[in-house]
Amino acid sequence: MKFFRSVGEVFGYSPFRSLAQHARMCGRAVGLLQQQFEALRRGNYEEVEELREEIDELEHHADQIKEEIRGNVTKSLMLPVDRHDLLEFLKVQDDILNNCEHVGHMVTFRKVSAPEDVWDEFLVLLSKLMEIVNNYEEMVERIMQLVETSFSKKEVNRALEYVPIIEQLEHECDLIQIGLHTKLFNLENSNPLDIQLMVTWVVHLGYVANAAARASDRFRIMILGR
């Protein structure tokens, strides 16, 4: 006879608390990227490198949590959501951190010179990214209330209210990216290598926003597919 365990019977282990902790790290990573770009603007490359190391450490810690969840969410563990949906959600959420790490490395490749209005636009983009991940974190934090209330309709609706907000913010992020690309491609007195690298930054910052939007959709699938 197949033996099933409840979530609370695995030495108190809860994949949902770990999922929420992993989501908080996404917000922390975007916050570190903001600091990196502020340091870039000031030309403080030592701080840029230190922040890259912080992002690397954060991503490594997040990977440990990810592997902990994968190792504990076995087929014999009884869950209130579909196991495959939970692991797919975790995979996409992890893309937020992976893309933050990529950007954190790319800004150390070269000392870039850019006009002040370009740095202004990068910080506007990062501010919008921070808004996205703040809403994303709040959404994932709701998962504990969902579990505690046995996924009551009221709590499900409250949690899923964040999904269209995140999607709208991701669209606004796209518009900022378009404006920033236009500005970069019209720089006449800048080094072409600097422009090329900054364009790559814009693209990968967009990947962070896209990952958050995709993860919010996977969250919705996980909650509604139970």
Curated annotation (Swiss-Prot):
NCBIfam families: TIGR00153 family protein (TIGR00153). It comes from the Archaea. The lineage of its organism: Archaea, Methanobacteriati, Methanobacteriota, Archaeoglobi, Archaeoglobales. Belongs to the UPF0111 family. It comes from Archaeoglobus fulgidus (strain ATCC 49558 / DSM 4304 / JCM 9628 / NBRC 100126 / VC-16). This is UPF0111 protein AF_1799. SUPFAM superfamilies: PhoU-like (SSF109755). InterPro entries: DUF47, PhoU-like_sf, Put_Phosphate_transp_reg.
